[in-house]
Amino acid sequence: MTGLMQGKRGLIMGLANDKSLAWGIAKQLSDAGAELAFSYQGAAMEKRVRPLAEQLGVARLFDCDVSDMDALDATFDALKAEWPTIDFVVHAIGFSDKSQLRGRYYDTTLDNFLMTMNISAYSLVAVAKRAREMMPNGGSILTLTYYGAEKVIPHYNVMGVAKAALETSVKYLAVDLGRENIRVNAISAGPIQTLAARGIGDFNYILKWNELNAPMRRTVTIEDVGGAGLYMLSDLSSGVTGEIHHVDAGYNVIGMKAEDAPDIALA
């Protein structure tokens, strides 16, 4: 796919480390010729992101707290000073108090509910509003979601609710921005051992269950997600918007445990 993204520029938000879904997408975009900028939050995250940026020759890094609208404005102003226009944005952002990603959903506190919804769902709306101003010739906005938005996944709790809001936001934004030739889509990735996933209770059990019951009898990789991301952000998907695209080895089509799947314990 060398050259598929040649001449295109975009911002990747939420890259955490080399296990991130965003990293899988960033590598594919870079290999296809895209020019990238990264955003991160805080000095600790910068230490992780900067070496990755160097690997891909990314020179534009921005510290951005998406829950702070002034900080978000400053990030896009700084990006606009470098690039007057962009072609795509990857929104790979979500956060919740990990102590509430175990146990029962009704134990979610109001403060954590509001914070999780703000960072994990509303931030896409805020980002899209600002990205739109830098996409006079159209573009593509891509976010990341999970099957816990559609069905109950143990311990996913308030993140499932936030991802459901995120997925619905994708559809409303797709309508708002479609006339401007700006496409908005989401990738619903199967469970992968990422930094964010480590905070979910019994995650290894969820991972193994998916492996044993998905039609392809495996879990997905960041390379799988990266390939789908490249498609969604390139002109190959020029007629696609408002979609929740599953990259989960087919797990989302399964209605019950596979006949040949062994029983597994939580431990």
Short names for language-model regions:
Residues 30, 84, 135-136, 175-180, ...:
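A short hydrophobic alpha-helix cap/turn motif
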Residues 64-73, 77-84, 88-114, 133, ...:
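Conserved mid-core segment of classical short-chain dehydrogenase/reductases
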Residues 34-48:
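Conserved glycine-rich Rossmann-like NAD(P)H-binding loop of the short-chain dehydrogenase/reductase
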Residues 12, 90, 142, 184-187, ...:
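Hydrophobic structural elements of the Rossmann-like NAD(P)H-binding subdomain
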Residues 122, 186, 205-240, 245-249:
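C-terminal helical subdomain
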Residues 2-38:
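Canonical Rossmann dinucleotide-binding motif of NAD(H)/NADP(H)-dependent dehydrogenases/reductases
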